[in-house]
From Swiss-Prot:
Source lineage: Bacteria, Bacillati, Bacillota, Bacilli, Bacillales
Reactions it catalyzes: L-arginyl-[protein] + ATP = N(omega)-phospho-L-arginyl-[protein] + ADP + H(+)
Gene3D superfamilies, alphabetized: Glutamine synthetase/guanido kinase, catalytic domain
Task performed by this protein: Catalyzes the specific phosphorylation of arginine residues in proteins.
Enzyme class: transferase
Name of the gene this protein is made from: mcsB
The protein's name: Protein-arginine kinase
């Protein structure tokens, strides 16, 4: 297993429900050990070793103090660790399975953060996988748990189930029709959070948004997932309606925009992250509307992931200035699109 190779994790490679709009679903469970201090201010490496002993050879342990900053950034770009772990978790670690659809962060904000990812809108599948791992760990180790408040976490907003359910969606239709602001406001009014592609503190790129629950106390895991699934079904419906409206009312203008973006990415020699993200979103929309038969959703995910800064530094084999990064990005994008 070489997680640092430029390849997609299984949840970005395989097909899933409603994957014309939904890229992926994720369940994250935050847990702390009963007799250990948290929040994890003074991290103890022995906590990592004790937890890692619970898992078999199906998981690979990667310690943050044994890999480079570039390798940490690659894990962030693949959504396998958080930016917090990359920047602040000296004695943190991550356990990964071969498919890279299970990521267990150790010594992040909490002692354990179990993440399970699935393609498309499959929150219940992700929940089932996460709870199975959680139950296995709880048989071996004692969690910090309160009968009144539930699972105790470093951040009070996670107390209760300790669960964050999130869905990554591509919403170019709602952005183009200028309905995205009202949709986001409606989502927030229902108690959910909308963030960028890399979660808290990140900005949307390629018209990709992350929608997650805010409430973890007073509801069961199943109730939270049911609520988020219902919200996502409404968003999916509205996005599909917006796409149909654009195609019917502005067909030539839309086709021109999509093929201009395709021409740009196929021929560019220098391209910024923002310009690439906008063009990739246009082409992904074109793929979903049937303009391109030779481009798969998998290839679109490759364009998003492998045009990120850390993967470009890996491709170049060195650090780069801003211009060099734009040149390498253009080269990588041309190679991905040209590989039919």
């Amino acid at each position: 297993m070489n997680v640092f190779e430029p390849r997609l994790s299984s949840w970005l490679e395989n097909a899933g429900d409603d994957d014309d709009v939904v890229l992926s679903s994720r369940i994250r469970l935050a847990r702390n050990l009963k007799d250990e201090q948290f929040p994890v201010y003074e991290q103890k490496e022995e906590i990592v070793d004790n937890i890692a002993e619970v898992f078999d050879d199906n998981f690979t342990l990667i310690k943050m103090n044994q890999i480079s900053l570039l390798q940490k950034a690659l894990l962030v770009e693949k959504h396998l660790i958080s930016p917090y772990m990359m920047n602040k978790s000296e004695y943190g670690a991550v356990l990964l399975n071969e498919e890279e659809n299970v990521s267990i962060m150790l010594n992040e904000e909490d002692h354990l953060r179990i993440q399970c990812m699935t393609p498309g809108l499959r929150l219940f599948d992700a929940l089932e996988a996460a709870l199975q791992i959680d139950g296995y760990v709880e048989e071996k180790l004692s969690y910090a748990f309160d009968k009144e408040f539930g699972y105790l976490t470093s951040c009070v907003t996670n107390i209760g189930t300790g669960m964050r359910a999130s869905v990554m969606v591509h919403l170019p239709g709602l952005v183009t029709t200028k309905r995205i602001k009202s949709v986001i406001e409606a989502i927030r009014s229902l108690g959910f959070v909308v963030r960028g592609i890399y979660g808290e503190g990140s900005m949307p790129a390629s018209n990709i948004f992350q929608v997650s629950n805010q409430v973890t106390l007073g509801k069961t895991e199943t109730e939270i997932v049911e609520d988020l699934t219902q919200v996502m079904e409404q968003i999916i419906m509205q996005e599909r309606v917006a796409r149909t409206t654009i195609k019917q009312k502005f067909h030539i203008a839309l086709e021109d925009r999509v093929f201009r973006s395709y021409g740009l990415l196929m021929n560019c020699r220098i391209i910024s992250m923002k310009e690439a993200s906008d063009a990739i979103s246009d082409i992904r929309l074109g793929v979903e509307l049937g303009f391109f038969e030779h481009i798969s959703r998998q290839k679109m995910n490759e364009l998003v992931l492998f045009s990120q800064p850390a993967f470009l530094r890996r491709e170049a084999g060195r650090d780069m200035d801003e211009l060099e990064e734009k040149v390498i990005r253009a080269k990588v994008i041309r190679e991905i699109l040209g590989d039919k």
